[in-house]
């Protein structure tokens, strides 16, 4: 076979080689090549073509080449004879090299052919082995599991493509690496221990769940099935088949997180879940349900436990609802109370739905929510509403809202009905209300409202009278403002009605008192001009023996007093017996006395007050002869003191009425300050129920809503406390006060007034001010009066910002000083000295008593109030109060 193949190759080799030699010959002849160069060219052709065929063909080409070399290039030309002896070695060398070269090449070709045949056989064997390996590799690669083969040191010997690609590697990247590198670092010790267990029990399968780490750092869960076996040379290896259980684990973890979140949500929202199989009686309670009912977690839940924990007053209704739900197989929802072992009470809202299990059994699934906090918030809300109603009742102020289009009330508080003499519980028509308004006042009231609507007055006021069913007259002062709708037109009027009957009566009483006071002052002045002291003398028996003639001439004392005892002419024996007992004891002891004051009557029978002092006198032997002394008619002084007390009382009543009136004028602000937190409480309570009613309650939002409810309730309570304090009529209570805190309290009350008048309040309060001794309510009244005056003074200001400045400081004399500065129209120079006087006012309405009352209050506190001239527009009122003694020390 080899010879035939060699012969087949010799013919084309010889033919092509001859053609090549001819071409080389022509080329060398053409270029007149040297003998040696031609020999080298022929040698290359012979050796080149010896690669194609047999040694015989190569030898033939060699002979042809020598003949051509001798014939064409060795002299003589065209002859086979070689004359030049120098060419003979070249020919010999050519022959040796070509023969040896072709032989070696032929030998090499034989060896290559033998190697090729052997390789073909080996290739066929390898192909068979490869086919078998491919079949096993296909099984290994296409198995839907990750396969690893590792040695006893944990080095990866083999891994299928799925095992590598699942981890984001190429197979070559894992071979030779430690299998522990593909496991999560926290799990490597566990895997090492599992591999060691497999090596200890060769042939025994082991299974475990563990986490692996992909090349990109992501984690997947796998279930490892591993078994150790003996490999070549009895060397142990571990075969590991891995199943990806990431989704299953994620589902399990998600379920665990969901259960944990549900448990936290139930704990935060105080909502427990439960289920109850109506057929088997089996029940399930969540942990929060056990906590709500305060029952041990080890206790088997049952409906009877609910009945036992239920408040005795609610037990019958709860049992009835459960029985009806069982009988009719229907959903149920109800609220009831729990009476816990510690005596506390909880309010529970429970609801359940009827479902069917996979086996078709009836089961109730529901939730029980602890709504105790919500119930308490509702109670607080109702209390706040009651506080608002009480505040309006105390100040005799009602609030209302009037729809301009329907020309009827949208809202009116119960106090409005009371002001008109109606029962708030009974419906009242608009015509009935109008019938109570005094006929003389109704047209004017309607005209004021019409002008406010037409001219869109932001704020307007008016007064009218109400005729009560008993015929009495109640005077009402109303403050209101317009509300502009989205269409730019007035849609609503909102305002307040204030009962100022007491204020009006107090004003009349004050005017009458002032008239009487002037008459009394004139009368006392006449008394003072005509009265004088007189001398008197009594005997040993203390009877009057002598009076100066002036008393009779002036008619100071009644006639016929001689011979009477002093207590016989006194008119206050029964009123002050102790005073007279002590005086008689002094006389019996013959001791001097001073400034005994008693009441008697003058010649006209009118009561007078006498102040007398006396001294005993004796004869030369020391015998007691009686008393001599001097008396003074102090009726004018006593009556002046009494008049001053009456005046102070009238001023106190006027101050109280002014406070109440100020509160009435600020009712819109106060109502806003109270209704704003009340509305927030309602909104937050509604939001809380909404958060709780979701399929998955939003506990964080519900908790925030409850916290906001508490904050708003506290804010409303603080506002009402301040209103009650200002409206209260009581004695002056002098206590150490922080004047800055008093300013802050007032700022909270007048916030709405500032907003409605577009006034900005700026406070510059000195820090660490010493305390003053004063009555909080009266000082609040002073500051409110100054602030309200400042606000009203800026109503006409349109060319600059309306700003009110309150400053506190200490002056050089050690007084705490407070000033209120506005940027209004200011005070005329000729009015500055009179602005603090009673009944002086620059307003179109009012008595002019506000600043006078402020001065009286400040002076009672030992302070002073004044008007400070300022360069710019507006006015500054300033008052200073002495420090509290403890602050001085």
UniProtKB/Swiss-Prot annotation:
Q: Does the keyword Iron-sulfur apply?
A: no
Its localization reads: Cell inner membrane
* Domain PAS, residue spans: 132-202, 384-456
Q: What class of enzyme is it?
A: transferase
Q: Which residues cross the membrane?
A: 16-36, 37-57, 60-80, 88-108, 155-175
Pfam families named in the record: DUF4118 (PF13493), HATPase_c (PF02518), HisKA (PF00512), PAS (PF00989), PAS_9 (PF13426)
Which superkingdom does the taxonomy of this entry point to? Bacteria
Q: What is its main location?
A: membrane
Described purpose of this protein according to its UniProt entry = Member of the two-component regulatory system NodV/NodW probably involved in the regulation of the transcription of genes involved in the nodulation process. NodV may function as a membrane-associated protein kinase that phosphorylates NodW in response to environmental signals.
Q: What is this protein called?
A: Nodulation protein V
| Species name | Bradyrhizobium diazoefficiens (strain JCM 10833 / BCRC 13528 / IAM 13628 / NBRC 14792 / USDA 110)
Highest classification ranks of the organism: Bacteria, Pseudomonadati, Pseudomonadota, Alphaproteobacteria, Hyphomicrobiales
Which gene holds the coding sequence for this protein? nodV
